[in-house]
UniProtKB/Swiss-Prot annotation:
The keyword Transferase does not apply. The chain crosses the membrane at residues 29-49, 54-74, 89-109, 114-134, 144-164, 182-202, 208-228. It holds the Pfam family ATP-synt_A. It is found in: Cell inner membrane. This is ATP synthase subunit a. CDD domains: ATP-synt_Fo_a_6. GO terms for molecular function: proton-transporting ATP synthase activity, rotational mechanism. GO terms for cellular component: plasma membrane; proton-transporting ATP synthase complex. Belongs to the ATPase A chain family. Key component of the proton channel; it plays a direct role in the translocation of protons across the membrane.
Length: 243
């Protein structure tokens, strides 16, 4: 067990691949866990939905619960116009939640602790929302940069501020997710290190505390996926609904 609690976030190469344009594209532990997350989601959906049973199986019930949750989240934040984007929101939620939960497992790796990963997901949301905004509102989508009732003399400054805030969305989304994942796993690692070094008679209480922390980390893993999903829906609302 490494003494440094941050070692768990290190990227390690599993096998090398030829570079492309001078860029390293080796298959790493991060690559492995992202592939695993994708496979788990795909297999889960395939096995759960391959048969239409009168009495749904446990997997189907879970998938339907997630689907209903996504529908409810979209309807409450975007409205019924946003239901056409269920696949986008469903994919984002399940991918982030699965990546987060895999990181809680022993020998797991938390890919969402890396800004490169969370920023890539955030950019998918940012580009998609921007494209959806122009699709639904055309050039009028740019009105998001100038709040109604803004005095003419203040308009240039407000446009600059709103443009900066809009472009900062993927940055804030990615940092929020990565920071929470790093913080939670680091705390667990530090406390686990104390437990190993303590006398055996003093271990039950710290061990119980670790179990509670792991349970809390599972809750945080799902919560962060939920927060990311809700913020995605809020941005979709800006893109679809005229303000």
């Amino acid at each position: 067990m490494s003494a440094n609690p941050l070692d768990q976030f290190k990227i390690s190469t599993i096998f090398k691949l030829p570079s492309i344009g001078g860029y390293n594209i080796d298959f790493t532990n991060a690559s492995l866990f992202m592939v695993l997350s994708t496979l788990i989601i795909s297999l889960f959906c395939y096995i759960g939905l391959r048969k239409e049973n009168i009495l749904p199986n446990s997997m189907q019930l879970i998938i339907e619960a997630i689907y209903n949750f996504i529908v409810s989240t979209i309807e409450s934040n975007v409205g019924r116009k946003g239901l056409q984007y269920i696949p986008l929101v469903f994919t984002i939620f399940t991918f982030i939640a699965t990546c987060n939960l895999l990181g809680v497992l022993p020998l797991g790796f938390t890919v969402t602790s890396h800004i490169a990963v969370t920023f890539a997901i955030s950019m998918v949301v940012f580009i998609s929302v921007t494209a959806i905004g122009f699709k639904h509102q055309g050039i009028h989508f740019l009105r998001i940069l100038l709040p109604k009732g803004t005095p003419g003399w203040l308009a240039p400054m407000m446009v600059f501020i709103e443009l900066f805030a809009y472009c900062a969305r993927p940055v804030s989304l990615s940092i929020r997710l990565a920071a929470n994942m790093i913080a939670g796993h680091t705390i667990i690692k530090v406390i686990a290190g104390f437990v190993i070094k303590m006398n055996i008679f003093l271990t039950p209480l710290p061990m119980a505390f670790i179990i509670i922390l792991i349970g809390f980390e599972i809750f945080v893993a799902i919560l962060q996926a939920y927060i990311f999903t809700v913020l995605t829906c809020v941005y979709l609302s800006d893109a679809i609904n005229e303000h």
